[in-house]
A protein has these predicted regions:
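Sequence/structural signature of beta-propeller modules
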Residues: 2-62, 293-310
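Loop/turn-rich, solvent-exposed surfaces of beta-rich toroidal or solenoidal domains
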Residues: 211-249
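Residue-level detector of Asp-centered blade-edge/turn motifs that repeat once per structural unit
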Residues: 74-76, 126-128, 171-173, 226-229, ...
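Beta-propeller blade signature
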Residues: 94-104, 189-197, 244-249, 290-310
């Protein structure tokens, strides 16, 4: 039986399950969202916390092809989103792709495939005009200029050593941060200077000892970004809930906590101070299974006004 068939067969059981599991409520209709909607899912996205702080919504590209959004970075008037492709809810790795999206119109303007061994594309960062893509055990880097407009870019790969995991990435002017994802306790965020990364010989492993600094970050960390005041923001989530934490970048102390859309992944600030984010809630390989009957549907790129968060 196909996943859609299984979902249909389970529909009769859902009425009983509703006594225990509440289905996500509908939020904004599809016509209020920029970009191209997928041909699956409900007619409206799910209601989410802090919706009043959201100033723009864009459909994530590649949804129908099975791409699951992970890392995010901002490059001028474009939002870049890294994703992996999967057709099974139990498989969370696959071919990686970076999508470029116009932040004003919501149009997907270009895309670049990332070579093997990329399989999850957990983090995306920009520093010194280079794009860094953090995968579980490998850091990919390539020149950003002309990346989407010419021949396929040449990615340099840097293996990640013990303790350093590319679950998320943070952009700075002359540095990037790589973070670990943990569910059972705090993760860690490591700061690497781009000059030091440039000096690494091909094949040299990047170790925790190479970091200029490191701090602890909360559990379930999916993305992070630094605002103009130098404060660290961390996106935390599962497919059912989301949260934005504001931390002191030196001590790692959590200063504020805000509810956020479920499935929130990569985040980044633009020049205007808006916080851009992307959610994997509603990715096709989850929604084509029985999980689509109970999970929130919010497969969007969205911009937040931090001043409106409550």
């Amino acid at each position: 039986m196909t996943r859609r068939g299984l979902a249909a067969a389970c529909a009769g059981l859902v009425g009983v399950a509703l006594a225990v599991v509440a289905l996500p409520q509908a939020g904004a209709p599809a016509e209020m969202i920029l970009g191209t909607p997928p041909n699956y899912g409900p007619a409206a996205i799910s209601e989410v916390p802090n919706a009043a702080a959201i100033t723009r919504r864009i459909w994530m590209p590649g949804l129908e092809d099975g791409y699951n959004a992970q890392g995010l970075a901002v490059a001028g008037g474009s939002v870049l989103v890294a994703a992996y492709r999967s057709d099974s809810p139990d498989v969370r790795r696959g071919p990686c792709r970076v999508f470029r999206v116009d932040s004003t119109t919501g149009s997907a303007t270009a895309q670049v495939d990332v070579p093997s061994p990329c399989g999850h594309a957990g983090g995306l960062a920009i520093a010194d005009r280079r794009l860094y893509l953090a995968d579980t055990r490998t850091l990919f880097m390539a020149d950003l200029d002309g990346m989407f407009d010419g021949p396929p870019p040449r990615f340099r790969t840097i293996p990640l050593g013990p303790g350093v995991t590319g679950a998320l990435a943070v952009s700075e002017m002359e540095a990037i941060w790589l973070g670990t994802y943990r569910e059972d306790g705090p993760g860690r965020l490591f700061r690497f200077m781009t000059a030091a990364l440039d000096r690494l010989a091909d094949g040299t492993v990047l170790n925790a000892s190479d970091a200029a600094s490191q701090i602890a970050i909360p559990s379930h960390a999916q993305g992070a970004a630094i605002d103009t005041a130098g404060r660290l923001w961390v996106a935390r989530s599962t497919l059912r809930w989301g949260e934005l934490d504001r931390l002191d970048v030196t001590s790692g102390k959590v200063e504020r906590e805000y509810q956020a859309p479920p499935g929130i992944e990569g985040i980044a600030f633009d020049a205007a101070g808006r916080l851009w984010a992307v959610s994997e809630a509603g990715a096709r390989h989850y929604y084509d299974s029985w999980r689509g009957l109970v999970l929130p549907f919010y497969p969007l790129i969205f911009a937040l006004d931090p001043a409106k968060l409550k």
